[in-house]
């Protein structure tokens, strides 16, 4: 099985939604040997130091504040195929969180590009139907 890099501007779209992160994100998407699942190698520059455990916990806490299935953090040792038909827009693999010198953090984020997107469109449709 092979994987290849994929063109993605997901992190740029995140900057539009979260403008205070502008200039702090850089990412590379990777197509993995499944039909729909991709992985994003996300690099973030922090203003202050933190451990990988603190970062993962902050992400878990943030996931609780967001609408359901937008963000997840997985502590399980999973493979790309395990994320097929996962409704979450992004799942951080906590086992791969790394902290480098100068407060540089690397995250591995999995997402089912088709299924999660379809789920968010359903969320929007439900929201609009209640207005």
Question: Model segments located where?
Answer:
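Single conserved hydrophobic/aromatic residue that forms the stacking wall/gate
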Residues: 1-7, 11
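Residue-level preference for beta-strand/loop junctions
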Residues: 3, 36-38
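Short Gly/Pro-enriched turn/cap motifs at secondary-structure boundaries
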Residues: 8, 32-34
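Glycine-rich phosphate/diphosphate-binding loop of Rossmann-like nucleotide-binding domains
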Residues: 14
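Short, conserved catalytic or adaptor-binding loops enriched in Gly and charged residues
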Residues: 17-20, 98
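A structural supersecondary motif
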Residues: 19-29
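C-terminal active-site/capping subdomain that shapes the small-molecule cofactor and substrate pocket
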Residues: 27-32, 39, 43-131
């Amino acid at each position: 099985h092979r994987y290849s890099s994929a063109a993605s501007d997901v992190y740029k779209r995140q900057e539009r939604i979260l403008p205070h992160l502008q200039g702090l994100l850089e990412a590379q998407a990777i197509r993995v040997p499944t039909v729909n699942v991709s992985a994003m190698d996300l690099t973030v520059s922090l203003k202050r130091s933190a451990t990988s455990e603190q970062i993962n916990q902050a992400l878990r806490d943030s996931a609780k504040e967001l609408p359901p299935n937008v963000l997840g953090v997985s502590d399980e040792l999973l493979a790309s195929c395990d994320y097929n038909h996962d409704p979450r827009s992004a799942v951080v693999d906590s086992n791969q969180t790394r902290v480098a010198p100068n407060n540089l953090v690397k995250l591995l984020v999995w997402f089912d590009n088709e299924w999660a997107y379809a789920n968010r469109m359903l969320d929007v449709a439900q929201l609009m139907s209640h207005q």
